[in-house]
């Protein structure tokens, strides 16, 4: 007798009540947990996406087919790519927490623009010499009448510092503690010092020549963080990136010496920060 036949015979010999109880027992044994679907990871926001979101209203009177090429042109000649990428790297890492409290990308940009030296929307066209002109056929074009010098006064800043400044400016976040914990994680907090030219290149394009690219991981309460926070203004050639949107090749003995000195004195008080400008052989600027 096959196993199936044996099971059928066994059930046939049971009373109706026992048969129902056995069926319930079998049903419980065969029940499986529902498959939990993990939400798909959202695509990281890049610099151009946020740039377009912020400045697109400059051309709100134009149809989309005209507006999009103009945004591409402005982005190609914008000197603040690294600031936009830095902001987006921070946003992408804390996006889940921000969206839980209805903080949109547009709202995040609104509160962070003032802290990164980026030109505000209303002043953008005039600041970079752009004019929107109407052609005889009724279409529009961008005309550039000036190529200004661009100075980057970005103070050394990490993701936690940027987020804190946004909170101080009024970013509406009822529970900032999970974000602070995320940005305080030393495995996330990466500081890159780089050097790039101060002048925006010609209409044909622009090139950033990084002379120094060294990354280092530090907890936010490390002496490095204290030193960075204590500098009021490094020379304009120094700026900071954070995140995983790119890497730079290069080596600087001066910067390596600086890091070694700080690491050797890792227990230094935050009230006695290491003089980074002195370590790098550059003057402090008050």
UniProtKB/Swiss-Prot annotation:
PROSITE patterns: ALPHA_BOX (PS51325). Keywords: DNA-binding, Nucleus, Transcription, Transcription regulation. Residues 40-95 bind DNA. GO terms for biological process: positive regulation of mating-type specific transcription, DNA-templated. It holds the Pfam family MATalpha_HMGbox. GO terms for cellular component: nucleus. It is found in: Nucleus. GO terms for molecular function: DNA binding, bending. InterPro entries: MATalpha_HMGbox. Belongs to the MATALPHA1 family. Required for expression of the heterokaryon incompatibility and sexual functions. This is Mating type protein A-1. It comes from Neurospora africana. The gene is MTA-1.
């Amino acid at each position: 007798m096959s196993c199936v036949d044996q099971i059928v015979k066994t059930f046939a010999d049971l009373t109706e009540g026992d048969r129902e109880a056995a069926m319930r027992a079998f049903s419980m044994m065969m029940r499986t947990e529902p498959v939990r679907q993990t939400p798909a990871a959202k695509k990281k926001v890049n610099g151009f996406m946020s740039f377009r979101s912020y400045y697109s209203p400059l051309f709100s009177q134009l149809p989309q087919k005209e507006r999009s090429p103009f945004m591409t042109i402005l982005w190609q000649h914008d000197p603040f790519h690294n600031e936009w990428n830095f902001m987006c790297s921070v946003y992408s890492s804390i996006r889940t927490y921000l969206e839980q409290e209805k903080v949109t990308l547009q709202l995040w940009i609104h509160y962070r623009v003032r802290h990164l030296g980026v030109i505000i929307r209303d002043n953008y066209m005039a600041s970079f010499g752009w004019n929107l002109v109407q052609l005889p056929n009724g279409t529009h074009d961008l005309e550039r009448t000036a190529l200004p010098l661009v100075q980057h006064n970005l103070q050394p800043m990490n993701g936690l510092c940027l987020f804190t400044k946004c909170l101080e400016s009024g970013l509406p976040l009822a529970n900032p503690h999970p974000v602070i914990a995320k940005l305080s994680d030393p495995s996330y907090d990466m500081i890159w010092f780089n050097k790039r030219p101060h002048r925006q290149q010609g209409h044909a394009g622009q090139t950033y020549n990084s002379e120094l690219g060294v990354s280092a991981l530090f907890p936010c309460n490390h002496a490095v963080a204290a030193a960075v926070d204590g500098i009021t203004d490094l020379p304009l050639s120094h700026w900071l990136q954070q995140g995983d949107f790119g890497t730079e090749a290069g080596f600087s003995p001066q910067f390596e010496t600086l890091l070694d000195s700080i690491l050797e004195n890792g227990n230094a008080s935050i009230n006695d920060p290491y003089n980074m400008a002195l370590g790098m052989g550059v003057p402090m600027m008050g």
